[in-house]
Amino acid sequence: ELYVEQWSNALCEKRKHLDVLGVGAYEKGKLIGLAGCSADCDTMWQIGVDVQPEYRRQGIASALTSKLALEVLAWDKVPFYCCAWSNIKSARNAIKSGFRPAWVEMTVKSREFVDEMNGGK
């Protein structure tokens, strides 16, 4: 069963009917990384990736993301990758894998809210 917490960026159990393609990285038969994509619309498939903690910082996420993006293109779909800008590791993976920022989502919060989040300063 792949619909578990450790693969929650690559696959989405609540929307498993949209998961259409995946690629994995293995070491000695053990799945150590997984990239999956969901058909969020007819023409564009979203890529998500997870790598087991002990295998991170070895280029596995980028290799999986890049490979899956090429596979998506072979299906005549547009691959896309979403992450929060605060998730710096994920944003770096996207850029390393050949993606470029196309849009940015912003959230506005009151100054009081921000001050409280910053320790009441």
Task: Place the predicted regions along the sequence by residue.
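Conserved acetyl-CoA-binding loop-helix of GNAT-fold acetyltransferases
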Residues: 57-71, 92, 96
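Short, highly charged C-terminal tails/helix-capping segments
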Residues: 85-93, 98-99
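Conserved catalytic-core motifs of GNAT/GCN5-like acyltransferases
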Residues: 100-117
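A conserved beta-strand-loop-helix scaffold within acyl/acetyltransferase catalytic domains
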Residues: 14-44, 49-52
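Conserved GNAT acetyl-CoA-binding A-motif
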Residues: 72-84
